[in-house]
């Protein structure tokens, strides 16, 4: 049985997720600090709310899509936040790529008020959000995850319950560590290919029929890098990828797990973010490596 649902955070990936929830259930209360985003969604049939407190009073399930755990804490526990107005039993579904320890602390503070919480990191970018095919990694109790499932099924395709609160966000950070590492090494390999006089699109095609293939070579390079498309549709901002990789590296350090490659990738991402700007989409890793190598990784058809 579904209940009145709210959505906070209507950014690049939040808005298409909110649209799909609205399509599935026919009702949605929305809030964003950018009121223009709320108005746009209201034109599609959502109920615009003027404050977090108003949204909390209208709903019993609240989905959050925010940049970091810091924003989640402010939205939930700050002045005028959700926790001050939400009824006991309200379920918060945190779609943010958050810090596992902070997610656990957030959950505990909400539980003290009788409010339920699950962390549900999402992967698949804007395209996956629009198509409702996101991968979703969940942390929370069995009962809370079961109650959240109808809403998660409205936005995602591959939905995996990883364990207790924090497990979803931990898994998301590991996913993005692998994403970043693949982006770095694939960009280096393709830059070398271009420098050696090989046609990048042919190298990508060969790799995608061989053991070196990955999501990066199968999707990001053909659809974005080879076309010279470094728009935000290609992936999250560099600042967010840096944050997620830092979560994995920090957790490895505190757990006594050696992570040579992960730490090197993190250092490279920070350098690239400094060079190209923190808001640059993460396929800009390839653009930075192109610059260092003095080549362009482009399809001959798009050159």
Regions found by a protein language model. Name each.
Residues 167-293:
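Helical "substrate-binding/catalytic lid" subdomain
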Residues 28, 48, 117-118, 159, ...:
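Hydrophobic beta-strand scaffold residues
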Residues 5, 10, 97-177:
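Rossmann-fold dinucleotide-binding core
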Residues 1-64, 90, 96, 161:
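NAD(P)+-binding Rossmann beta1-loop-alpha1 motif at the extreme N-terminus of oxidoreductases
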Residues 52-64, 68-117:
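Rossmann-fold NAD(P) dinucleotide-binding segment
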């Amino acid at each position: 049985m579904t209940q009145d649902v709210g959505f906070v955070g209507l950014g690049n990936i939040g808005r298409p997720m909110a649209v799909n929830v609205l399509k599935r259930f026919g009702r949605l209360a929305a809030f964003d600090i950018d009121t223009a985003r709320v108005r746009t969604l209201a034109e599609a049939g959502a109920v615009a709310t003027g404050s977090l407190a108003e949204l909390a009073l209208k709903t019993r399930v609240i989905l959050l899509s925010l940049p970091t755990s810091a924003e989640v804490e402010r939205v939930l526990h700050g002045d005028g936040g959700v926790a001050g107005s939400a009824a006991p039993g309200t379920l918060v579904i945190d779609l943010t790529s958050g810090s596992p320890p902070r997610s656990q602390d957030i959950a505990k503070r909400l539980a003290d008020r009788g409010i339920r919480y699950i962390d549900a990191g999402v992967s698949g970018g804007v395209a996956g959000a629009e198509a409702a095919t996101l991968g979703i990694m969940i942390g929370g109790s069995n009962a809370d995850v079961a109650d959240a499932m109808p809403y998660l099924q409205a936005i995602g395709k591959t939905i995996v319950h990883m364990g207790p609160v924090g497990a979803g966000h931990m898994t998301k950070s590991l996913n993005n560590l692998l994403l970043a590492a693949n982006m770095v090494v694939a960009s280096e390999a393709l830059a070398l290919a271009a420098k050696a006089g090989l046609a990048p699109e042919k190298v990508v095609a060969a790799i995608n029929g061989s053991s070196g293939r990955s999501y990066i070579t199968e999707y990001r390079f053909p659809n974005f890098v080879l076309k010279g498309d470094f728009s935000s549709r290609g992936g999250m901002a560099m600042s967010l990828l840096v944050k997620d990789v830092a979560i994995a590296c920090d957790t490895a350090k505190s757990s006594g797990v050696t992570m040579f490659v992960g730490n090197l990738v993190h250092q490279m991402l920070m350098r690239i973010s400094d060079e190209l700007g923190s808001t640059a989409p993460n396929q800009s890793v390839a653009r930075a490596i192109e610059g260092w190598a003095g080549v362009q990784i482009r399809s001959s058809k798009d050159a």
